[in-house]
């Protein structure tokens, strides 16, 4: 079971002033994981939310998103899940290629962005 959540909480803060506290995000994420594990025995793959600075105002999203990324990292350890560090991977990829190539709005991946995610997932989970 692969989970990638968190960026919409950040987005709502900046477009609608709907604030989701990091501790609430963590509690909700843990409920999702716990309820899933009560019913199933999946291999868990947690991917951190990400944002690229496109448009430029996305830079200020870091103040909200970084806490969520840290929470996902902590939960991956706590639940012994595979962890795919998408935020770092996208920023690393964007060091040599324009941000828009990966995510034209900083959040929603292009075909190339989806390819980056798929490659990272395969390398993390299957070692390929």
Give residue spans per PLM region.
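Alpha-helical cap/lid subdomain in secreted, periplasmic
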Residues: 1-128
